[in-house]
Curated annotation (Swiss-Prot):
GO biological process: translation
InterPro entries with a match to the protein in the record: Ribosomal_uS10 (IPR001848), Ribosomal_uS10_CS (IPR018268), Ribosomal_uS10_dom (IPR027486), Ribosomal_uS10_dom_sf (IPR036838)
Known function: Involved in the binding of tRNA to the ribosomes.
Family the entry assigns: Belongs to the universal ribosomal protein uS10 family.
Keyword Chaperone among UniProt keywords: no
GO molecular function, one term: tRNA binding
PANTHER family: 30S RIBOSOMAL PROTEIN S10 FAMILY MEMBER
Identification of the protein by name: Small ribosomal subunit protein uS10
One GO term describing the cellular component: ribosome
Pfam families in alphabetical order: Ribosomal_S10 (PF00338)
This protein's UniProt keywords: Ribonucleoprotein, Ribosomal protein
């Protein structure tokens, strides 16, 4: 029989927030007796935007903005019912997007 696994993927714009959330998830899973692989940092997506400062002329005057999306991946191997319960009750920061897959 194949081992059961929970794959958790986190996305956030702030790297401190995502690291804090990842450590909370790892600590909760280990406390309930599950084995955790990760957090594995995935490549950061950088979106750059260039905006003209002047409304009419002066094409040389521009501002550049960058939006970074940080991602982390974690696998929880052989989770118990207690682990799933604790993860569902876990309250993470509002700026972190969480995707959970059961395999």
């Amino acid at each position: 029989m194949a081992k059961q696994r929970i794959r958790i993927r986190l996305k956030a714009f702030d790297h401190r927030l995502i690291d804090q959330s990842a450590s909370e998830i790892v600590e909760t899973a280990k406390r309930t007796g599950a084995q955790v692989l990760g957090p594995i940092p995935l490549p950061t997506k950088k979106e750059r935007f260039t905006v003209l400062v002047s409304p009419h002329v002066n094409k040389d005057a521009r501002d550049q903005y960058e939006l970074r999306t940080h991602k982390r991946l974690m696998d929880i191997i052989e989770p118990t019912d207690k682990t799933v319960d604790a993860l569902m009750r876990l309250d993470l920061a509002a700026g972190v997007d969480v995707q959970i897959k059961l395999n």
